[in-house]
Amino acid sequence: MRNKAVVLLLLLVILAINVEQSGSLGGVNVSSRVTYTIKGRFLLVNTNNITVNDYVYISLPQNTSFQQSFVLGIEPSPVRFQRDEDGNIFAVAYIVAKPQEKIWINVTYKVVVSSYSIDTSASKGVWPNFLLLKKYTSSTRYWDIYNTTVVKIAYDVAYTSYPLATVESLARWVVSRVNYNVNLGRSGSDHALIYTSRGYRIQGDCVEVADVFITMARSLGVPARGVYGFLLTSYKEHQWLNMSTVQSEGEGLLTHWGGHMWPEVYVDPYGWIDVDMLDGMSPNVGVFSARHIVFGFEETKYYGAALTSSCIPSYMTLEYIDYIFEGELG
């Protein structure tokens, strides 16, 4: 009964999310559907020399037009569900831990994801209204739309009369300039775009690629935001992350960790469409595979996206993350 209550409460909270976040289904072709059972666990350690009372924020898979999410269980049981200003839903657990005590948090989710592609013949896109522009084209810490170099490149390579053509041109340019390497920090668009002997390149991982694309799209008047979650290589996977070895692993962590970030843009009549250029190193404008699991959106807040956003303690230390994905096609 308790698990059913958790599911019901989460659904009621998520249903309150603004319709704008789900987007439109006009001109969109939905194809395969995959149902995942996701089991996760997070190891927290109290490294302080006193007992701590900690509120731990647990990222939950979100509901979108192409993803339905259900919480089947969380232990310890959450004291509440909370929505942030970007519309993301978190479970909040209250933990009391003695000095050096280790505590596991266990979660189980059911997530149904649909692959989709937009029908580009349906529309060239319509430029957004003022409210969307105001919210989704502003400058932020990592998306500096006042950087004249970034803005000039965006206009040179992607300025067109139609938003969809602009996004497609921009995606082609960005994916052709990627110098991929794991970045445990976050450079932001100002520092991710560098000039080399081969011209401008984007140095970093999925976060830097997304940051540069979002900044350029916003500078061109296209509403854009970041999405964080997972990109799987198959429907059944075991993924884990040991925070104590991340620094030394480098690109080796990609063999067992698929935490991911990618951009979304808003183009009427399609609504929010994904642009994951690192899925097969292709522009992928409005082409989305069911190997993605969405855990949240970045519009104004920043959680670390690809690494630590799964579980966010206030005073304790996150030491280990483990996920098992069991997906069934059909």
Segments and roles (model prediction):
Residues 300-330:
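TerminUS-proximal long segments
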Residues 18-116:
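Intrinsically disordered, low-complexity N-terminal segments that are enriched in acidic
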Residues 211-307:
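Hydrophobic/aromatic-rich core segments of domains that either
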Residues 47-49, 98-103, 161-163, 218-220, ...:
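A short, structured loop/turn motif at beta-sheet edges
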Residues 97-200:
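Acidic low-complexity segments
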Residues 1-30, 56, 263, 330:
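Secretory targeting signatures
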Residues 71-75, 121-133, 277-282:
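Short intrinsically disordered coil segments
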Residues 166-170, 202-217:
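Active-site nucleophilic cysteine motif
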